[in-house]
C-alpha cells in the first residue's frame, strides 16, 4: 500500500485463485472473496477504490499440481499486479499467450 500511496497514478488488479477442491461455483466465489479481501485491505490503507480492480478465476490457471497438498496450497493464492503507468492493468483472461 505504501508504494501505491507514493505512486498515485498506478492502477492495480487483484486476482484470486483456488485449488481444484470443491465445486466450480464454490471455487469461483471463493477466488472472488480472496481478491476482494486484498482490495479491502488496500482501501483501508487509503488507496482509492477506482484504482483497484478485482477478478476471481476459481481453479483456473494453477501454478502447481492439484494432485499434492503442497501443490494445492500453492494454487490457493492472490496475485497483485501494479501498472507501470496510469492505464488499468489487463486481467489475465485478456492477455494473450
Specify the residue positions occupied by each region the protein language model found.
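Periplasmic OmpA-like peptidoglycan-binding domain that tethers envelope proteins to the cell wall
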Residues: 7-10, 15-92
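Short, solvent-exposed mixed-charge patches
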Residues: 95-97
Amino acid at each position: 500500500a505504501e508504494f501505491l500511496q507514493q505512486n498515485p497514478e498506478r492502477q492495480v488488479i487483484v486476482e484470486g485463485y483456488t485449488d481444484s477442491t470443491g465445486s466450480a461455483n464454490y471455487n469461483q466465489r471463493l477466488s472472488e472473496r480472496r481478491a476482494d479481501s486484498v482490495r479491502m485491505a488496500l482501501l483501508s490503507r487509503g488507496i482509492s477504490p477506482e484504482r483497484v480492480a478485482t477478478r476471481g478465476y476459481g481453479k483456473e490457471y494453477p501454478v502447481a499440481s492439484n494432485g499434492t497438498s503442497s501443490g494445492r496450497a500453492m494454487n490457493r493464492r492472490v496475485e497483485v499486479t501494479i501498472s507501470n503507468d496510469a492505464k488499468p492493468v489487463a486481467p489475465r483472461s485478456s492477455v494473450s499467450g
